[in-house]
Amino acid sequence: TMVRDGLVFKDEDGQVIFNQYSFCELVKHLLVELVGISYEEASQIVERSSLATPVADAMEVAIFSHELPYYCAMLLYYGNGYWQKGIPAQPEDMDAHEALEKKIMEKYDLKEPFIWT
């Protein structure tokens, strides 16, 4: 199944739009930028992962939304406990990292992954 944007989930607090395609693409491009692998390899890694599986409800979306795309990318490539292998647990320069995410999203016309309404 192809992941797509515009998935709407409702719960008692309101609704969330999960742009799953954009989220997956952002993680792929972070793998390319931060790890230095090809887009093809990054795509295979992401598409085999839980990031690309169908999401059932708002609760699952909420769980995803607590993970930084950086964290998802590093976890997928380096595995659990990647921070024990000398990989920073989170971006060392958060401003630079946010600028990188923004640049990727603009360049590839990606949507904000999570929109709570």
Please identify what each model-predicted range represents.
Residues 1-117:
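C-terminal alpha-helical interaction appendages
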